[in-house]
């Protein structure tokens, strides 16, 4: 077995954490020029991943150490969400905006972030973030709020292939939210509930509308909520693995995105893959981490 799937804090998953040095001299040096990267003048870069349902940010220093991270819900306007997370992460880090020598954006809303210096695709950023966390990773499954993607990496961490499902919400976090609402269960409770399942129930449709009708029918048949939840997770896993097969099921699996926090989905995926999934301490920040790493490459 390559690795265990137990979630740990970001630093225990390979991201060293350091307290930011916030002296005025260091602020000035870091803001003046990229060459300020030295032992006496810390450099800070920020990566921001503007997704459909969450906006995530990471600040690293010149030693690739994690200074701070943040995750918030994306509102109606991605630009406003970006401003909110900028304020939050700077407060966490004890830094000022002027301390950030580079800001790189990624995700669907990356071009709507006015304070970003440049933007990079989420595929590239997920690949870089995943390889940084664990160089053994070869196949990434990312399930977000409204899309899912599979990415293949080579031993150097380069993206060699990828596929995306962004045409509908089937098998995504939004799909899970709809099913949880139909079951009258909190989305945060759905995964744990499904682990109590004792009967395999098949959900034949991944279309949100038809799947909801199936779930309502199963409720009318007095099926256990835990069994229905397990059936929903089985359907999501089947769709996800079908996506992964298109880039090649090479062992060294990693799952990112908000759905990686659902233990029911993770369990079913591992059973069907017959292998463990590597899940970082905060699976939603992998794209932002990759963006920050790209930022460091630009200035160091």
How does the language model describe each region?
Residues 1-122, 261, 270-271, 275-277:
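N-terminal glycine/serine-rich phosphate-binding loop of ATP-dependent small-molecule kinases
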Residues 73-74, 118-127, 141-145, 163-171, ...:
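Active-site nucleophile and cofactor-binding loops and adjacent substrate-binding regions
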Residues 186-218:
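Internal, active-site/partner-interface "lid" segment
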Residues 108, 245-272, 280, 284-287:
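Glycine-rich phosphate-binding loops at beta-strand->alpha-helix junctions
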Residues 11-13, 30-40, 108-158, 290-300:
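Conserved phosphate-binding catalytic cores of ATP/NTP-utilizing and phosphoryl-transfer enzymes
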Residues 77-78, 155-199, 293, 297:
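Glycine-rich phosphate-binding loop plus the immediately following alpha-helix
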Residues 211-244, 284:
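Adenine-nucleotide phosphate-binding core of ATP-dependent small-molecule kinases
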